[in-house]
Amino acid sequence: MNARIAEVQRKTKETEIKMVLNIDGDGEYKISTGIGFFDHMLQLFCHHGKFNIQVEAKGDLHIDDHHTIEDVGIVLGQAFLKAISDKRGIKRYSHIILPMDEALIMVAIDISGRPYLAFDVDFRLPKLGEMNSQMVVEFFRAFVSSAKVTLHVKKISGENDHHVCEAIFKAFGRVLKDACTIVDDKIPSSKGVL
């Protein structure tokens, strides 16, 4: 099997992002976005998905966190799409129901070539640490659009926003890793292409 590694750089007037993604890693990461809570969520994603990621993001945080978080989602999606290549042999589908204390989250994915996000999560507070809670859905919307995957995220229960968000990123890492697992040498579609 070829190494499933991708390097992506994106520079706009709002952000500059460099990322290296190894799908078949062991959970090592070096993450710097300037947004502590977001860094923590990406670390959880890497640890639970066993992805190796190096990301350095510089953005217009003097305005807010929107451009940085959204653009990291875009770059992660681009890196994933590049690393997964023609998707030959992957499992394609995965789902999980993951608890974190009182929070219970369902995440399901189809590496389909069709971008779609169903995000049924409400946060009680406007901020998660210094991160705008509305940016969680924007991160996933950006990832889904660039990675060309179908992703469902649903909060079954949860009172503590931190627990809910942690459970989402842990579950996301686990389902993405599982769906990327090589199970044979065929394209997982009756059409013969994804």
Curated annotation (Swiss-Prot):
One GO MF term on file is:
imidazoleglycerol-phosphate dehydratase activity
The keyword Zinc is annotated on this UniProt entry: no
Query: What processes in GO biological process is this protein linked to?
Result: L-histidine biosynthetic process
The UniProt keyword set, sorted, is: Amino-acid biosynthesis, Cytoplasm, Histidine biosynthesis, Lyase
List the GO terms this entry assigns under cellular component, sorted alphabetically: cytoplasm
Q: Which Pfam families match?
A: IGPD
* Catalytic reactions on record: D-erythro-1-(imidazol-4-yl)glycerol 3-phosphate = 3-(imidazol-4-yl)-2-oxopropyl phosphate + H2O
Q: Where in the cell is it found?
A: Cytoplasm
- Which CDD domains does UniProt cross-reference here? IGPD
EC number, UniProt record:
4.2.1.19
Write out the pathway annotation from the protein's UniProt entry: Amino-acid biosynthesis; L-histidine biosynthesis; L-histidine from 5-phospho-alpha-D-ribose 1-diphosphate: step 6/9
Q: Which family does it belong to?
A: Belongs to the imidazoleglycerol-phosphate dehydratase family.
Provide the protein name.
Answer: Imidazoleglycerol-phosphate dehydratase
Task: Name the gene that codes for it.
Answer: hisB
